[in-house]
Curated annotation (Swiss-Prot):
Its EC number is 1.18.1.-. It holds the Pfam family Rbx_binding. It catalyses: 2 reduced [nitric oxide reductase rubredoxin domain] + NAD(+) + H(+) = 2 oxidized [nitric oxide reductase rubredoxin domain] + NADH. This is Nitric oxide reductase FlRd-NAD(+) reductase. It comes from Salmonella arizonae (strain ATCC BAA-731 / CDC346-86 / RSK2980). It is found in: Cytoplasm.
């Protein structure tokens, strides 16, 4: 490959892919282009920055230049890719262009901000760059509204509460983690957050944010008003697909790829939070790590279909940590819950009596690995 491989993006997926490529080929030309600084940080740490009094710069693990030297790369930080000419195999920015043999989209996902009046007052914590932009406000804030009771919202609510802040956690659903598990399973976390002092506003919808003398006034659809110092959107992620769409690639929720991580164009691939693998968007670390292993082989001339085993997802809520695995969101499962003082095991069983999902908390989390082996692949 005389022109080599170009990767657009510099997050976890891009870095894992670089490491896997270099394990197999030390010399193929590798170029990374990204809009950020390309310094490495651990994105899950963003869920704990406030309680641990970390500044954005504290999260940096490796500078971009060190990464480039270690893995023999060309890096183009702070560079927005404007267009891809898929037929000509050319990537274009405003003032540069690069030719490639193979192209990988690792463009990630953007935080979704609800389309309410005053949405510009809402903060997001989806990157080191976003945290850097709002860290002074967040550290000073005493009253915090978090909109969204999913994984990130629950993690942030616990973290801000542990830091001594007054936290209101709001969601349209009747329970936390509603898209991941039934309320009888998530209720243990819900009670723990309430016991810690988090104010839950479930079955509630944000209608408007506006500046007030006391900070920010949040008005709910019920017309209840809450005065806060900061409002955070934790209402999910949307895969970054605009560049792929302009290149003429097939898009659904994410950039559509097959088991080889190949898009609708044979020389363009996608990985990470932007990719939709055979109909599934999997924005978790383990599937990204495995995707990087297989994609590296495919980029270097192999033909290795991605095989994903049953995988654990960890909810990073230190006062009540959780593992979940399998099809926890299925509505037709029968849940068998054993809850004791040291933790909980909830097993989701099919009508045929087969284990299809489970959730484990606290000291019972050590049982998760044995249960994982019982899940169908």
């Amino acid at each position: 490959m005389s022109r080599g491989i170009i990767i657009i993006g510099s997050g976890f997926a891009a870095r894992q892919l670089v490491k896997n490529i270099r394990k197999q080929d030390a010399h193929v030309p590798l170029t990374l282009i990204a809009a950020d600084s390309m310094d490495e940080y651990n994105k899950p740490d963003l869920s704990h920055v406030i309680s641990q009094s970390q500044r954005a710069d504290d999260l940096t693990r490796q500078l971009a230049g060190e990464f480039a030297e270690q893995f023999n790369l060309r890096l183009f930080p702070h560079t927005w890719v404007a267009d891809i000419d898929a037929d000509a195999h050319v990537v274009k920015s405003q003032d540069k262009q690069w030719q490639y043999d193979k192209l990988v989209l690792a463009t990630g996902a953007a935080a979704f901000v609800p389309p309410v009046a005053g949405r510009e007052l809402m903060l997001t914590l989806n990157s080191q760059q976003e945290y850097r932009a709002c860290e002074t406000q967040l550290r000073a804030a005493q009253r915090v509204l978090i909109v969204g009771g999913g994984l990130i919202g629950s993690e942030l609510a616990m973290d801000f509460c542990r830091a001594g802040k007054t936290v209101t956690l709001m969601d349209n659903a009747a329970s936390l983690l509603a898209s991941l598990m039934p309320p009888e399973v998530s209720s243990r976390l819900q009670h723990r957050l309430t016991d810690m002092g988090v104010h839950l506003q479930l079955k509630s919808q944000l209608q408007e944010l506006e500046k007030s003398e006391a900070g920010i006034r949040a008005t709910l659809a019920s017309q209840r008003r809450i005065e806060v110092d900061a409002a955070i959107a934790a209402t999910g992620l949307r895969p970054e697909t605009a560049l792929a769409r302009r290149a003429g690639l097939v898009i659904n929720h994410g950039v559509c790829v097959d088991s080889y991580l190949q898009t609708s164009h044979p020389d363009i691939y996608a990985i990470g939070d932007c990719a939709e693998i055979n109909g599934q968007v999997l924005p978790f670390l383990q599937p990204i790590q495995l995707s990087a292993m297989y994609l590296a082989k495919n980029l270097l001339g192999g033909k290795a279909p991605l095989k994903l085993p049953a995988m654990l997802v960890k909810v990073k809520t230190p006062e009540l940590p959780l593992y979940l695995a399998g099809e926890t969101q299925r509505r037709d499962l029968s849940w068998h819950i054993t809850a004791e003082s040291d933790g909980m095991i909830a097993k989701g069983m099919s009508g045929e009596g087969q284990l299809r999902a489970f959730v484990a908390s606290e000291d019972r989390m050590k049982e998760a690995f044995a249960l994982l082996k019982m899940l169908p692949v």
